């Protein structure tokens, strides 16, 4: 059984015991979080079930930052160069349970 969840403006296909990296959540390490925006579920024989009351429970493993992304702007012949960097805050989750409340 797997679920498709949405968090941080992105969609993730998850199963139980999966480890995913998502946009930062306000939760401390070891805390249980519930992701309630479930788009689709699969049941036995991989048929798709659409449920409104489904949720996914996960535990927070780590709060970290992603790799640095370099932003570089240049206008030729004008001596205009700008270099900037950005590191996005991330949360690492372990999916513990997929709740199907029909």
Swiss-Prot record:
Keyword rRNA-binding: yes
GO molecular function: rRNA binding; structural constituent of ribosome
This protein's record includes keyword Acyltransferase: no
Cellular component, GO annotation: cytoplasm; ribonucleoprotein complex; ribosome
InterPro entries (alphabetical): bL21-like, bL21-like_sf, Ribosomal_bL21, Ribosomal_bL21_CS
Superkingdom field: Bacteria
UniProt record, GO biological process: translation
UniProt keyword terms in alphabetical order: Ribonucleoprotein, Ribosomal protein, RNA-binding, rRNA-binding
Secretion signal, residue range per the UniProt entry: none
Family, as annotated: Belongs to the bacterial ribosomal protein bL21 family.
Function in brief: This protein binds to 23S rRNA in the presence of protein L20.
Family matches, as NCBIfam families: L21
UniProt subunit comment: Part of the 50S ribosomal subunit. Contacts protein L20.
Protein name: Large ribosomal subunit protein bL21
Native source species: Ehrlichia ruminantium (strain Gardel)
Lineage, broadest ranks: Bacteria, Pseudomonadati, Pseudomonadota, Alphaproteobacteria, Rickettsiales
Gene, per the UniProt record: rplU
């Amino acid at each position: 059984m797997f679920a498709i969840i949405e968090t941080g403006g992105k969609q993730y296909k998850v199963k139980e015991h999966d480890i995913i990296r998502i946009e930062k959540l306000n939760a401390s390490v070891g805390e249980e979080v519930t992701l309630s925006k479930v788009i689709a579920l699969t049941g036995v024989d991989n048929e798709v079930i659409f449920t409104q009351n489904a949720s996914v429970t996960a535990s927070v493993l780590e709060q970290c930052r992603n790799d640095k992304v370099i932003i570089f702007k240049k206008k030729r012949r004008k001596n205009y160069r700008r270099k900037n960097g950005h590191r996005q805050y991330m949360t690492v989750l372990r999916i513990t349970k997929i709740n199907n409340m029909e």
